[in-house]
Amino acid sequence: MKTTETKKREIADQLIQSMKTAGTGFMLPWVQSGMPTNLGRLGTKNPYYYGINNLILWREKNYSKYKSNVWGTFKQIKDKGGMVNKGESAIDVVLWRPFEVTDTYKRNTSSHKKGDTYQKSCFFITFFKVFNMDQTTLKDKYAPNQNIEGAKSKVDVETYISNTKAEIQHGFDKCYYVPSKDFIAMADKSDFKATVESNATQNYYSTLLHELTHWTGHKSRCDRDLQGYFGDDSYAFEELVAEIGAAVQCCILGVTSTPKKESAQYLNSWIKRIEKDPDALFKATAKASQAVKFVEG
């Protein structure tokens, strides 16, 4: 049986290979295939997969040319009256299990003394196996473009963005988030051009969703490290978080995304960091998911 570390390395290696092959567009064909949904979460508030499971299932769907966006365990499929087709293989996805550990305070404060103990919540990774509905007798029931119960209908992009209450200023020659003043600087919508992947309007929104992901990193929101400088590891890591977060939001909203030109400058940093430490990929996707959930409210 493969260990957790071996499986994490395999997942990281698959993404690295995609980065090396497709460059900054490594997520494009996956994202355009739609949000992966969970057969076992019918009727829940949010039936979507998030985090690293997005990348795992996006890549697998594209690689195996599946048409359905719905995935389920053997038991979930059986409970829905279906069966897995003979000879089909499952894919591992990640489950984060919480546990508590005892830690000690490192300094005195008004509420506790140095050395006092407290309980801290942590998580460990386990894996479980899922099948795409194309691999089962439920294929026709969960055909392409058929969302399962509980999946969100497409939301108007402007409404989605305005609901965040983020301060967005237009008229700039570049697009970026300013943590010290907590606003997003955007070029005018008319300044955006069409590309092979998407039209000008979609490029505007995919860029804005990238910057909106950065906006969630403010200390009053998801509190990520936004103090990095261009070229260093922390800066490149935050860009990976924003790239994944924007891709997920584009997928949810039905926006065809185009990678930022600047992403090419971070690509080698992403590859080197993930090659050195597969956990960096898991951390980036977890933080991107936290950002998306914050924006969704």
Task: Give the label of every model feature segment.
Residues 1-297:
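N-terminal accessory/interface modules of nucleic-acid-binding and processing proteins
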